Design a protein with these regions (language model features):
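A phosphate-binding catalytic loop at a beta-strand-loop-alpha-helix junction
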Residues: 75-94
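Intrinsically disordered, low-complexity regulatory segments in eukaryotic proteins
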Residues: 144-145
C-alpha cells in the first residue's frame, strides 16, 4: 500500500511519510502531527488534535475544509495527512468532499474504496454528520430571510 492516495484532482490523502515523497504538492494539511516537508515553497497548515474518543473535531471542520477548498480552487495540490493516514486525515478529507462535492455517504465510500486502510472512528463520523446537518440548517434559515 502506498503511503498516499489521490482522492480527486489535486487532493491527496496520506500518512506521515507521504510528505517527503510527493513532489508535486503545494500545500500540506497536517492533522495532529508535524509535516516532514522542509521545502520553503510548500504551505504547511497544522491542525492540533489528538486521536482520542475525547477529541471534538466539530470546531475544526469548517476552517480545514474551507482551507482545502480555497487551495484546490487556486489549482494547488493539497495533501491531507496524519500519522497513519487511517482515521484523522481521512475524516477531514471526507468532510471536504461531503461539504463541496458529494454526499457524506458517497464521500465515505469513495475514500474507503480508494484507500482500503481507512478506519474512521464512529465518534468522528457522528461529529461530521452533525456538523454537515448544522450547515444545511444554517443555509436553509439564511435562504428564508
Amino acid at each position: 500500500m502506498k503511503c498516499y492516495t489521490q482522492l480527486t484532482e489535486g487532493l491527496y490523502l496520506g500518512n506521515q511519510f507521504s510528505t517527503s515523497i510527493i513532489t508535486e504538492i503545494n500545500v500540506i494539511v497536517s492533522i495532529g502531527c508535524k509535516s516532514k516537508s522542509t521545502i520553503p515553497s510548500i504551505v504547511n497548515y497544522k491542525v492540533s488534535v489528538r486521536d482520542s474518543v475525547d477529541s471534538d473535531l466539530t470546531p475544526l471542520f469548517g476552517d480545514v475544509t474551507e482551507f482545502i477548498h480555497i487551495n484546490l480552487s487556486n489549482n494547488k495540490k493539497v495533501l491531507v495527512h496524519c500519522q497513519g493516514g487511517v482515521n484523522r486525515s481521512p475524516i477531514f478529507a471526507i468532510a471536504y468532499l461531503a461539504r463541496y462535492i458529494m454526499t457524506l455517504e458517497e464521500a465515505v465510500l469513495h475514500v474507503s474504496t480508494l484507500r482500503s486502510t481507512v478506519r474512521i472512528q464512529p465518534h468522528y463520523l457522528h461529529q461530521l454528520e452533525k456538523w454537515l446537518n448544522d450547515i444545511i440548517i444554517c443555509k436553509n434559515q439564511t435562504n428564508k430571510l
